[in-house]
Amino acid sequence: MNQRNASMTVIGAGSYGTALAITLARNGHEVVLWGHDPEHIATLERDRCNAAFLPDVPFPDTLHLESDLVTALAASRNILVVVPSHVFGEVLRQIKPLMRPDARLVWATKGLEAETGRLLQDVAREALGDQIPLAVISGPTFAKELAAGLPTAISLASTDQTFADDLQQLLHCGKSFRVYSNPDFIGVQLGGAVKNVIAIGAGMSDGIGFGANARTALITRGLAEMSRLGAALGADPATFMGMAGLGDLVLTCTDNQSRNRRFGMMLGQGMDVQSAQEKIGQVVEGYRNTKEVRELAHRFGVEMPITEEIYQVLYCGKNAREAALTLLGRARKDERSSH
C-alpha cells in the first residue's frame, strides 16, 4: 500500500471499528485501522484478528494496522471515527492538526456529547471548522454479525452529496452490506442515541419479567419519544421509520448482544447500577445517553416519560419496578398526542 492511497482510515480499534474496517477491506479497499493502545495494535497485527472481540474473523490482506496517528491520518483523506460518544470531541481535537488538507470525516459513533447533550455534528463543527465534509452512518449493526459477513443494512447521511455517494460506494456490498442514503443528517444521528436509552428500558422490563407485550409497548412508545424529539430538532419523522430509527431500536431492544439491553435486564433483576456496569465489562453507551437525551429533551421542551423514568433509575436510585409502575399509572391519553 502506498502511504497515501488508502480508501479509509478507521479511528478506533474496538469491536465495531474493527468490524467496519474488515467490511471495507473485504470490499477490496485498502484500509488503515488505528487504535490508541500500541500493545493492542501489535496484538492485532500478530494475530491478524481481533481475538478479544471478534474471534475467528481473520483480517483481509488489505487491512493494515497502525499505532502511529500521524501515519494513519496521512494514509487517507477519508476518516471513519468509531469511538465512544463521551470521547468523540477529544478525539476530533486530537486528530485535527494531523489531518490532510483534503480530509473528509464520517463517524459511526452513536450518542450525544457528554454533559451538554449536543448532537455530534455540533461537536465536529466546533472541533474541525465549517469547511470539512461530514457524514454519519447508523443503523442496526451488531459488530460480530457485521464482521462475519451476515446480511446487514444501515443509513448514511452527509453534509456533502459527493462524500455521501463516495461512502455509499465504499461501504455497500451487494452480498451482505446494504447502505441506504438519507438526507436527514439530524435524524440519522439522533436515532442512534435515543435507541440506547429505550433499550435499557426494554431490558428492565424483561428483567422484571413483564413479558413480550410490555416490551413491545415500550419499544413502540419509545419510538414515539424518539420521533417527538426529532421533530423538535428539525429532523424528518420518516427517518425514524428507517434503519437509523426503528431498525436500530428493534435490534437493540430485543437481542441480548446489546449491552444496553443486558444492562437493563440486570437492573430489572435487582442489581445496582455500578455492579451491572462492571458485569457488562464494556462501555454501556445508554448510561450516559440517558442523561444527555434527557438534557436535550428539557432544552427543547419535549416530554419523554420513558427516558425520564430510566434516568430516575440510573441517576436517582429509583427501583426499576417502581419506574415501570409509574409509566403504567400515567393518565389516559390519545396515542397520537405529543406527550
From Swiss-Prot:
<feature type="binding site">
    <location>
        <position position="195"/>
    </location>
    <ligand>
        <name>sn-glycerol 3-phosphate</name>
    </ligand>
</feature>
<feature type="binding site">
    <location>
        <position position="110"/>
    </location>
    <ligand>
        <name>NADPH</name>
    </ligand>
</feature>
<keyword id="KW-0521">NADP</keyword>
<feature type="binding site">
    <location>
        <position position="141"/>
    </location>
    <ligand>
        <name>sn-glycerol 3-phosphate</name>
    </ligand>
</feature>
<feature type="binding site">
    <location>
        <position position="15"/>
    </location>
    <ligand>
        <name>NADPH</name>
    </ligand>
</feature>
<dbReference type="InterPro" id="IPR013328">
    <property type="entry name" value="6PGD_dom2"/>
</dbReference>
<dbReference type="GO" id="GO:0051287">
    <property type="term" value="F:NAD binding"/>
</dbReference>
<comment type="similarity">
    <text>Belongs to the NAD-dependent glycerol-3-phosphate dehydrogenase family.</text>
</comment>
<dbReference type="InterPro" id="IPR036291">
    <property type="entry name" value="NAD(P)-bd_dom_sf"/>
</dbReference>
<keyword id="KW-0560">Oxidoreductase</keyword>
<feature type="binding site">
    <location>
        <position position="258"/>
    </location>
    <ligand>
        <name>sn-glycerol 3-phosphate</name>
    </ligand>
</feature>
<feature type="binding site">
    <location>
        <position position="285"/>
    </location>
    <ligand>
        <name>NADPH</name>
    </ligand>
</feature>
<keyword id="KW-0443">Lipid metabolism</keyword>
<feature type="binding site">
    <location>
        <position position="260"/>
    </location>
    <ligand>
        <name>sn-glycerol 3-phosphate</name>
    </ligand>
</feature>
<comment type="function">
    <text>Catalyzes the reduction of the glycolytic intermediate dihydroxyacetone phosphate (DHAP) to sn-glycerol 3-phosphate (G3P), the key precursor for phospholipid synthesis.</text>
</comment>
<feature type="binding site">
    <location>
        <position position="36"/>
    </location>
    <ligand>
        <name>NADPH</name>
    </ligand>
</feature>
<feature type="binding site">
    <location>
        <position position="139"/>
    </location>
    <ligand>
        <name>sn-glycerol 3-phosphate</name>
    </ligand>
</feature>
<keyword id="KW-0520">NAD</keyword>
<protein>
    <recommendedName>
        <fullName>Glycerol-3-phosphate dehydrogenase [NAD(P)+]</fullName>
        <ecNumber>1.1.1.94</ecNumber>
    </recommendedName>
</protein>
<comment type="pathway">
    <text>Membrane lipid metabolism; glycerophospholipid metabolism.</text>
</comment>
<dbReference type="GO" id="GO:0046474">
    <property type="term" value="P:glycerophospholipid biosynthetic process"/>
</dbReference>
<feature type="binding site">
    <location>
        <position position="248"/>
    </location>
    <ligand>
        <name>sn-glycerol 3-phosphate</name>
    </ligand>
</feature>
<dbReference type="InterPro" id="IPR006168">
    <property type="entry name" value="G3P_DH_NAD-dep"/>
</dbReference>
<dbReference type="GO" id="GO:0046168">
    <property type="term" value="P:glycerol-3-phosphate catabolic process"/>
</dbReference>
<keyword id="KW-0594">Phospholipid biosynthesis</keyword>
<feature type="binding site">
    <location>
        <position position="110"/>
    </location>
    <ligand>
        <name>sn-glycerol 3-phosphate</name>
    </ligand>
</feature>
<dbReference type="InterPro" id="IPR011128">
    <property type="entry name" value="G3P_DH_NAD-dep_N"/>
</dbReference>
<feature type="binding site">
    <location>
        <position position="259"/>
    </location>
    <ligand>
        <name>sn-glycerol 3-phosphate</name>
    </ligand>
</feature>
<feature type="binding site">
    <location>
        <position position="283"/>
    </location>
    <ligand>
        <name>NADPH</name>
    </ligand>
</feature>
<feature type="binding site">
    <location>
        <position position="16"/>
    </location>
    <ligand>
        <name>NADPH</name>
    </ligand>
</feature>
<dbReference type="Pfam" id="PF01210">
    <property type="entry name" value="NAD_Gly3P_dh_N"/>
</dbReference>
<dbReference type="InterPro" id="IPR006109">
    <property type="entry name" value="G3P_DH_NAD-dep_C"/>
</dbReference>
<feature type="active site" description="Proton acceptor">
    <location>
        <position position="195"/>
    </location>
</feature>
<dbReference type="InterPro" id="IPR008927">
    <property type="entry name" value="6-PGluconate_DH-like_C_sf"/>
</dbReference>
<feature type="binding site">
    <location>
        <position position="143"/>
    </location>
    <ligand>
        <name>NADPH</name>
    </ligand>
</feature>
<feature type="binding site">
    <location>
        <position position="259"/>
    </location>
    <ligand>
        <name>NADPH</name>
    </ligand>
</feature>
<dbReference type="GO" id="GO:0046167">
    <property type="term" value="P:glycerol-3-phosphate biosynthetic process"/>
</dbReference>
<keyword id="KW-0444">Lipid biosynthesis</keyword>
<dbReference type="GO" id="GO:0005975">
    <property type="term" value="P:carbohydrate metabolic process"/>
</dbReference>
<keyword id="KW-0547">Nucleotide-binding</keyword>
<keyword id="KW-0963">Cytoplasm</keyword>
<keyword id="KW-1208">Phospholipid metabolism</keyword>
